[in-house]
Amino acid sequence: MLPGEAPAAYVQRVTGLKLQASLARLKRRGLPPAPVLCADTTVALGRRILGKPATADEARAMLASLSGQRHRVMTAVAVGCLGEQAGEPARGWSGLSESWVTFAPMSEREVQAYV
């Protein structure tokens, strides 16, 4: 995440980078032009992005922070295709889906059961 980057901008940027890397790989391998679909999803509690927990303790802490809270789940998608002719630029389209989710309050025992 870049300093001061909003969650929506972050997920769109990451998805765009995935698309660029995928199109570059197609070109590098000399494969014929084909549509490439990339996506990324992030959860944000306010402006704080919640990444994938690496440990059970992190998962418990994340669920506890979401307990009783309203947060956003954002998925960015991007579709691109290399140009048909050599030197023709790639074309692309992108979009963002944003959903608001409210977790019911969870006890410590309920959080533990999820993990």
Task: Set out the residue ranges of the language-model regions.
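Anionic-ligand binding patches
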Residues: 2-115
